[in-house]
């Protein structure tokens, strides 16, 4: 798949997002992205839209290692996600 081809031609981090398609609903994409040979790493996230969201967050985490402003925004984002989950939990339990 494309992520593996890209990873074979660069020294930059590559994030693979398996796309849900076909009779296996993306499982074939997941396996081909995960099973790369030694020396050709691909960071692989979940199949579909949740994987795409996690890929974006992972990319920001990588970039934030060298950018304090981005690191703070990421921290704020994660705190906000936690607060949203707590609000949803409170609604479910009330």
Language-model features, listed with the residues they occupy:
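C-terminal binding/interaction regions
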Residues: 27-94
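Glycine-rich phosphate-binding loop
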Residues: 1-18, 22
């Amino acid at each position: 798949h494309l992520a593996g081809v890209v990873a074979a031609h660069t020294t930059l981090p590559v994030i693979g997002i398996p796309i849900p398609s076909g009779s296996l609903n993306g499982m074939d994409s997941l396996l081909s992205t995960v099973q790369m040979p030694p020396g050709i790493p691909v960071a692989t996230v979940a199949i579909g839209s949740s994987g795409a969201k996690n890929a974006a967050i992972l990319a920001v985490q990588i970039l934030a290692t060298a950018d304090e402003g981005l690191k703070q925004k990421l921290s704020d984002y994660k705190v906000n996600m936690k607060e949203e989950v707590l609000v949803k939990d409170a609604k479910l339990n009330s």
